[in-house]
UniProtKB/Swiss-Prot annotation:
GO CC entries: cytosol
Keyword hit for rRNA processing: yes
Protein name: Ribosomal RNA small subunit methyltransferase A
Positions that bind S-adenosyl-L-methionine: N27, L29, G54, E75, D101, N123
Annotated keywords: Cytoplasm, Methyltransferase, RNA-binding, rRNA processing, S-adenosyl-L-methionine, Transferase
Gene source species: Bartonella bacilliformis (strain ATCC 35685 / KC583 / Herrer 020/F12,63)
Transmembrane domains' residue ranges: none
Superkingdom classification of source: Bacteria
Subcellular location: Cytoplasm
Family that this chain belongs to: Belongs to the class I-like SAM-binding methyltransferase superfamily. rRNA adenine N(6)-methyltransferase family. RsmA subfamily.
Described function: Specifically dimethylates two adjacent adenosines (A1518 and A1519) in the loop of a conserved hairpin near the 3'-end of 16S rRNA in the 30S particle. May play a critical role in biogenesis of 30S subunits.
Gene3D superfamilies named among the record's database cross-references: Ribosomal RNA adenine dimethylase-like, domain 2, Vaccinia Virus protein VP39
Amino acid sequence: MPIDNLPPLREVINAYGLQANKSLGQNFLFDLNLTSKIARQAGNIEGKPVIEIGPGPGGLTRALLAKGAIVTVIERDKRCLPALLEIEKHYPKKLNLIFDDALKQDLSKLSETYPEKPRIIANLPYNIGTQLLLNWLLTTSWPPFYESMTLMFQREVAKRITATPQSPHYSRLSVLAGWRTIAKIAFDVPPQAFIPAPKVTSSVINIIPRPQPLACSVQKLSLVTKVAFGEKRKMLRQSLKTIGGKELLEKAGIDETRRAETLLIPEFITLANLMT
């Protein structure tokens, strides 16, 4: 069942010659039922501001607009302009187009133009998805500029974002995400849902900011997690050697023979807060 009166995405992609650009990390979703499922994950978005990164030909964009959202898309590939302009005509005053590199955009300033905090909903380009997420997790002010995030990543990345201590995917990204947010995998998306089909399964995750995360310096927690997981197979007394090693661990009351993958998030916070 169509979500609007616009052409099917396969026709749009063919009509405008939109072959996915590997260097931009593009994989286009073409199943509008699936894009609608992603839009539903964000809850009631009718009349709500939404920011989408990397819309491509606009499959998810159409699903968000069909749900009544006020959407701003950020796209650096100008080949997508004609397809997005067609959507803009269909949804007058509901779609704002920004053609730029998402890594160069200050979304916190953009959000100040909205009457309420936006939701970020996106099938993120694979090559910049993790960096974008880190930028949004490590904002200077908290609570952040966004209400929630519903994002698609490669499944391996999604597992690292949502992993818990002692699990094989527990990583620096798990700690930084778990410190300030609650992140959960909603569902998986098979490779055949994309054009072109990637070699891996993708996952949609929901991320909700914690209103009052444990107090900690962003810079210090970034550093302690970077060095700890940089040599995660080593004991902490060795992996943390450059930032205090045994002395820091003793102050924190943490066994120096443990490894990064065993530490709880509050223990990483303690280490960061004790750094000089």
